[in-house]
Amino acid sequence: MYPSQGVGVIKTIEEKVFKSNKVLYYVIYLEVSDMTIMVPVDKATGLGIRPIVGKDEALKALELISEEYEPIPSDWKLRYQMNMDLLKKGSIMDIAMIVRSLYHRSKVKELPILERKLYDSALKLLEDEISCSLRKSKEEVENLIFTRLETETE
């Protein structure tokens, strides 16, 4: 999982010479953007690249989105920055919190364009990771997510 980019598959590990040093790189294919990237193996963790979560963690993220939550600041710029910080951390629980809070905020008032894009990105990241983790179609996971989101509001 690559924060803010989504689920990727390590295709190979290649050795390249960089500034006269041999460096190992992950060659990662990101399906969502149909893009291949190279990331130095020794910097991958620092960049937030992590394995897909296990089934238990994916189910916890689904549970989180149906739990009660603290209302978020009404100032959208502050909300946006807080959520961007969570997105950069890249944990599935942080992404689930973004989806939950912005979904419920959108029910109160239409989200500003930047926040709407952030919500859409976080939702896609959450769907993709849970889909891979639970081995379910993206459509099934999308239905699960929205069912959970609606459960809390009723």
Predicted regions and their residues:
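A positional/architectural concept
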Residues: 1-47
